[in-house]
Amino acid sequence: MKPIRFFLAVIVSMLTLGLVSCQQPQEEAQTQDQAEDQAQDQTQAQERVQAMDENGAPLFQVDPFWPGPLPNRWSMQQVTGIHVDHMDIVWFLNRPNGAEGDEIAGGVEEPYRMACCTKSPEVIAMDVDANIVHAWGDADHHPNWPRGLQTVIADRDGYVWVGGLAPQDSILKFTREGEFVWDFGRRPPEGVQMEEDNAETEVLTQKGRFQLDQDEREIYIINWKRVLVYDMDTGDFKRGWGGHGMPLEEITNDPIPPYEWDGTRPPEEPNFVPAMHFIETSDDGLVYVGERGQNRIQVFQKDGTWVQDIYVAEWTPADRLGPTQCAGVTTRKELPVCGVMYKMAISKDPEQNYLYVADSGNSSVWIVNRLSGETLGSFGGNGRYAGQLHWINAIATDSLGNIYTGEVEHAKRIQKFEPVWE
């Protein structure tokens, strides 16, 4: 029997080696097929004409079946960030901080609930058909894993950047498979509460809202009342500016005074008005910064030269009203949600004609003409049914014209809105 067993072992080994040797070409062929399918879909999307409403706003409709339940009984939690990469892979953060007691269960402590729901990886990537291609990350994944996850960006070089807003959170760089590569650092000392100092560029808090400029190899970070730009490879500081392009040393470190809401736009303020909630860059070299405290987008050139202000739903009570009049995600539930500028995405048509503004205050996505700043229309509306929105806190677009939204608080989901074609 021993010679027979040996012969069988040799045969199995040879077959295994054959499978391994064939696996890489098969994977490469699959990747090539996906790229070809993506190019074909992009061509078809460009050839079709998207339907418009009477005001010239492009029309969208929700796909009520996308993405469907997550695999492995993973619990869908707060979707705080979404990014669609150059291959139309949708990356999103599934932050479990606000999980209810009945939403994540099972394990050793609750074996009687194993059929219910489990904690998922906190970084998930799926294709346009909701097939999961990557999933990794949590507090056990890396010792400095962000506790206040806010932003995920997958660059075209094959790396994924993750950042959070907790005091000790920074920006971490991983491979697409989740292998750690680099830590931006610049954390304050443990347990030290930093006082606002808008001229300080070496030690930073709340670095979780950032953007990458891969052409210039730069990281844009917003916090307090400024934009800071660092080298994307070395982390060295390069430049920064405040509201309307003011120098860092001229930015006030005092709180922006609240105002009495009267149904009109907040009083004009040259400084950025916290919370600064997003920063995006366009292909023609413009930088867009959203201020939840002012219902305003300030537009700049990359050197910090101010270009224009864009107000959206300016009559909305702004976050500048303060905590006595505005709700938080987990606190002051009896109060309304304040502010418009939660996140923003830029359309991926060749001219990048539209800004899509995710507005939690009005549970809507506003469609804005990028060059004129004119609001053309909106979709959404408060609720938890498909196509409605509640505490929207993330938005992204792909090359096919789809819009992806993420919700926090108790909504806890990601949705896909598809173009309506004529």
Question: Which sequence ranges carry the predicted segments?
Answer:
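C-terminal motif of bacterial Sec signal peptides marking the signal peptidase cleavage site
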Residues: 18-21
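Hydrophobic helical h-region of N-terminal Sec-dependent signal peptides
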Residues: 8-16
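Intrinsically disordered, low-complexity repeat regions of secreted/extracellular protein precursors
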Residues: 34-38
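Eukaryotic scaffold repeat domains enriched in small/polar residues
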Residues: 23, 28-30, 41-422
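Bacterial N-terminal signal peptides that target proteins for export
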Residues: 1-8
